[in-house]
Amino acid sequence: IGTACELYSDSEGVYGERIMPEHIDRESFLFNSPFIHGSMMFRREVFRCHRYRTLGKNRKYEDYDLFMRLCADGYKSANLTDKLYCFYYDKALRAVSFSMRCDEYKVRMECFRMLGLMPKGIIYALKPILLGFIPRRATMKIKEKTNKV
């Protein structure tokens, strides 16, 4: 189970929020991870069968990878709509390298297959790579207008 959060930075203090979907199904993973990693709580038994995979392709995306594998294995998950977590998010420091975008693409392709989301998932798997071609300033404006910061 996860929760919504407030966003804050040193320069702005609390400046926004992220409200995550309450009910999660396999399609919830297509656009982005439907969870705020730091807010997640698990039953201990989950980690008897599943672990974070940190080799190669999923560096920085091990949480997204784990959440999708758990969903593929039939585990149920949800988010509380209450903002019970504060997340430090400095917009100025949020650059993503092209190699990281490629890593996310690989994780998405593998896990979307496990979730039975292909061929629909191909477009969503390409999202991180396609975003790499859009100027950073433009993506930040889009995020601000859609409250996705």
Where are the regions that the model predicts?
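Catalytic core of nucleotide-sugar-dependent glycosyltransferases
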Residues: 87, 94-118
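Terminal low-complexity segments of carbohydrate-biosynthetic enzymes
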Residues: 129-149
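Flexible domain-boundary/linker segments
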Residues: 17-18, 64, 87, 121-125, ...
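Juxtamembrane helix-loop transition sites at the ends of transmembrane segments
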Residues: 57, 109, 134-137
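Short beta-strand segments
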Residues: 2-4
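Conserved nucleotide-sugar donor-binding catalytic segment
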Residues: 6-11, 16-99
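Membrane-interacting alpha-helical segments
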Residues: 102-105, 116-123, 127-135
